[in-house]
C-alpha cells in the first residue's frame, strides 16, 4: 500500500494575515499614544496640585 500525504490549506490568504497584523499594529500605536497623553496629563495635574493629591491619597488610606 502506498501512503499519500494530503496537504490542506489554512483557509486564509497571507494578505488577510498581513492586513490584520497591520491593523493590530495601528491599534497598538494608537493606544500607546493615548496612554502617553493620559500620563502627561496626570503629570501636569500632579505638578500643579501635588500637595492636594498626597493629602487626598493619605485620607483614603493609600488605597
From Swiss-Prot:
The modification Deamidated glutamine is found at residue 63. Pathway: Protein degradation; proteasomal Pup-dependent pathway. It comes from the Bacteria. One of its GO terms (biological process) is modification-dependent protein catabolic process. It holds the Pfam family Pup. Residues 1-36 are annotated as: Disordered. Residues 23-51 form a coiled coil. The keyword S-adenosyl-L-methionine does not apply. The N-terminal unstructured half of Pup provides a signal required to initiate unfolding and degradation by the proteasome but is not needed for pupylation, while the C-terminal helical half of Pup interacts with ARC to target proteins to the proteasome. Belongs to the prokaryotic ubiquitin-like protein family. Protein modifier that is covalently attached to lysine residues of substrate proteins, thereby targeting them for proteasomal degradation. The tagging system is termed pupylation. Strongly interacts with the proteasome-associated ATPase ARC through a hydrophobic interface; the interacting region of Pup lies in its C-terminal half. There is one Pup binding site per ARC hexamer ring. This is Prokaryotic ubiquitin-like protein Pup. It comes from Mycobacterium leprae (strain TN). The gene is pup.
Amino acid at each position: 500500500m502506498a501512503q499519500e500525504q494530503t496537504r490542506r490549506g489554512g483557509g486564509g490568504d497571507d494578505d488577510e494575515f498581513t492586513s490584520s497584523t497591520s491593523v493590530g499594529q495601528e491599534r497598538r500605536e494608537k493606544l500607546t499614544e493615548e496612554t502617553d497623553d493620559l500620563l502627561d496629563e496626570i503629570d501636569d495635574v500632579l505638578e500643579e496640585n501635588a500637595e492636594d493629591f498626597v493629602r487626598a491619597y493619605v485620607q483614603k488610606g493609600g488605597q
